[in-house]
Amino acid sequence: MSDNLYTYGVIEQEDIELEIDGVAGAERVYTVDYRTLSAVVSDIDTTDPERTDEDVQVHNTVLQHVLEYDGGRTVVPMSFGMAFKNGRTLKGVMRGARRALRSALNDIEGTVELGVKIITSSEGGVSHDAIRADIGDRLSELSINETENDLFSDRLVVNKSYLVARDRRDDFDAAIDTIEEEYGDELTVQYTGPWAPYNFVDIHIGADQQRGR
């Protein structure tokens, strides 16, 4: 049996075991500890997993389970494909990245990421700048941080990720509901999450580190 470990993210030290599907057909998800940190992992037979739509969805679903575990956990997410040769290699990477991981956990403690796309019903009508200003003001005051994502369509006027404290989540939800009610058919709101805060952490792990080189 392979000792390879697929890694979803890092949390404060805690023993967690989830009987849920993992990437590449894994049947359970559990934690590997290094000092005050725990990596959320599952077993895998390779250090170079194939990226499929199904497994990307599984990766995100596992992170959502951790986010919601026993009232909610703060998690520093790893990008898809972070698989390590064995537990020793993983712990070595955690040791080297400990300060960055600790800083990231502190920065996002008690938060989730929420995605908001606003699409106009036509290219005419309400000013796009006015929509951006109005919605931006409403949502910015309910969030800790935000990032701008690509506006890949002329009708896409807002595409942002928001870092929101868990205790402001209901307020943020209510603001989205109000926006939908007030703008009616003029806008379509695509509201997603909660997600692990991918857009608000910046930790890089190279292929050589994954393979223990």
UniProtKB/Swiss-Prot annotation:
Q: Kindly list the biological process annotations in GO that this record carries.
A: gas vesicle organization
Tell me one Pfam family matched here: GvpL_GvpF
This entry's comment on induction and repression of expression is:
Transcribed from early-log phase, decreases as cells enter stationary phase, probably as a long gvpF-gvpM RNA. Highly expressed in 25% salt, poorly expressed in 15% salt, no gas vesicles are formed at 15% salt. Accumulates in exponential but not stationary phase (at protein level).
* Protein's cellular compartments: Gas vesicle
Location (main, coarse): other
Return the GO cellular component terms, semicolon-separated: gas vesicle
Q: Which UniProt keywords apply?
A: Gas vesicle
Highest taxon of source: Archaea
Family (UniProt): Belongs to the gas vesicle GvpF/GvpL family.
Q: What does this protein do?
A: A minor component of the gas vesicle, may be involved in preventing GvpA aggregation during gas vesicle nucleation. Gas vesicles are hollow, gas filled proteinaceous nanostructures found in some microorganisms. They allow positioning of halobacteria at the optimal depth for growth in the poorly aerated, shallow brine pools of their habitat.
What extra comment accompanies this record? Encoded in a 14-gene locus called mc-vac.
Per UniProt, subunit arrangement is: Binds GvpA.
| Protein name according to UniProt | Gas vesicle protein F
Instruction: State the species of origin.
Output: Haloferax mediterranei (strain ATCC 33500 / DSM 1411 / JCM 8866 / NBRC 14739 / NCIMB 2177 / R-4) (Halobacterium mediterranei)
